[in-house]
């Protein structure tokens, strides 16, 4: 059952290279710095930093869309959500083998490196790879009928 336009959020997702999504949604879920946050129409306005993770949208047509986010910022107004990120990938753009290789490389760097700045970078790369892999796992579980938005 469709929802009226007056009950939907206008959502924009962009990264440094392109506009990823522009449309109307009934729900947005994003990985805020302090935990996952869900946004519905008429939400209290706020601005938050986003950590690596997944963005989930429920579109005007009732379709669920999934994106990987490397980190960024989200601004929420009562009827609008804007997400600005370093990198955003649609779920179908994620390369599982590349994410596994990045995970292994980051784990190796964490084991071998004692320089604090280098360890911080390796940890961030590990978080990014794990976020991509978790999103793929969620989608596989969803295909098997075991998971919902």
From Swiss-Prot:
Keywords: ATP synthesis, Cell inner membrane, Cell membrane, CF(1), Hydrogen ion transport, Ion transport, Membrane, Transport
Topology of the protein relative to the lipid bilayer: Peripheral membrane protein
Subcellular location as annotated: Cell inner membrane
Single annotated GO MF: proton-transporting ATP synthase activity, rotational mechanism
Cellular component annotations (GO), alphabetically ordered: plasma membrane; proton-transporting ATP synthase complex
Similarity comment: Belongs to the ATPase epsilon chain family.
NCBIfam families assigned: ATP_synt_epsi, PRK00571.1-4
Assembly and oligomerization: F-type ATPases have 2 components, CF(1) - the catalytic core - and CF(0) - the membrane proton channel. CF(1) has five subunits: alpha(3), beta(3), gamma(1), delta(1), epsilon(1). CF(0) has three main subunits: a, b and c.
Name the UniProt record assigns to this protein: ATP synthase epsilon chain 2
